[in-house]
Amino acid sequence: MAPSLRVAVTQAEPEWLDLAGTVKKTCELITEAANNGARLIAFPECWVTGYPGWIWARPVDFELNTKYIYNSLSIGSPEFEQIASTAKRHSIAVVLGFSERTSTHSLYISQAIISPQGATLLHRRKIKPTHVERAVFGDGSGADLSNVVDVDFGGDVGVVKVGALACWEHTQPLLKYHTYSQGEVIHVAAWPPIDPHPGVEHPGLWSMSAEGCQNLSQTYAVEGGGYVLHCTGVCTEKGMETMGTHKGLLFHTPGGGHSCVIGPDGRRLTQPLHGGDPAKEGIVYADLDLTNVVANRSFLDNVGHYSRPDLLWLGVDRKQKQHVIPRDEEEPSRKANVVVPKQE
């Protein structure tokens, strides 16, 4: 029998601007998914503690921004360890999207992959926040390019390569190609709540709509030849009221939920939850036949037989850039460029 892995893709609304409440809900969803046989669960972009939708209405809001910082999640914090402990207790891998808070109160759009054993296998930051997201979040660095890890599911499944990107990172050809090159089998495409496009005459970008974003995830599946867990959040009247987004470009109507599972050839494998009501919460489940990845790549492997690295290749700098480098720890290349004045 072919190895099969049950996955769970959340379509849920966070407890907006409430770290403790969202962590509690996260653990409840992890438990629910595990009780239904899932061995991996995916969460959307900035699930903890909600995507800051007000930035698309008013980029400067000191009160909300400050509250958002205080309610963002720090790596190694008790709240993070609570999520990891829940994953370990239920032997389920967790791919978590969150607003990361550093010790200096900077924020990053981050993702973590937690193993069924409770270990943090991956912590990465979005390479470049999109448009007005830059009013809140900083950039990732070289280490964040390594975004695929080996997850040991044990039993008949064993080790599977799982990776993640956030939102419009799925528009970046070089970043996608680098991710493919790491041998990814299951990819989590994390998105915020996203709404259908209003129509051809509307000035809003189709590529930011529910249809456009799913198209990007399906394209990713085709190019990468692996399964894609397309994970979106939900925003109801509660979120709109909390963030004051009724008159904003985005988050002005209840909805946003369009989670699904996409096969290695790009086809959608699951039906919309609740008859397609994007304001309803739930979990999408799918049983993945991992041999389909092998079969698909016998036709198309963009980082293998279906490529020409002798003609086209990608250069990568994976070094993490530090803000402060002591002089005695400078790289040789930096030292070589230092000009020491002659002593008279």
Swiss-Prot record:
GO molecular function ontology, one term from the record: aminoacyl-tRNA ligase activity
Organism domain of life: Eukaryota
InterPro entries given in the database record: C-N_Hydrolase, C-N_Hydrolase_sf, Nitrilase/CN_hydratase_CS, Nitrilases_CHs
First-tier enzyme category under EC: hydrolase
E.C. designation(s): 3.5.5.1, 3.5.5.5
Keyword Transport in record: no
Record-linked CDD domains: nitrilases_CHs
Protein keywords: Aminoacyl-tRNA synthetase, Hydrolase, Ligase
Nucleotidyltransferase in keyword set: no
Region (Disordered): 324-344
Catalysed transformations (reactions): a nitrile + 2 H2O = a carboxylate + NH4(+); 4-chlorophenylacetonitrile + 2 H2O = 4-chlorophenylacetate + NH4(+)
Domain annotation CN hydrolase: ranges: 5-290
Catalytic residues (positions): E45, K126, C167
Function: Nitrilase that hydrolyzes preferentially phenylacetonitrile and (R,S)-mandelonitrile. Also acts on dinitriles like phenylenediacetonitriles (PDAs) 1,2-PDA, 1,3-PDA, and 1,4-PDA, and cyanophenyl acetonitriles (CPAs) 2-CPA and 4-CPA.
Family the UniProt entry places it in: Belongs to the carbon-nitrogen hydrolase superfamily. Nitrilase family.
Protein name: Arylacetonitrilase
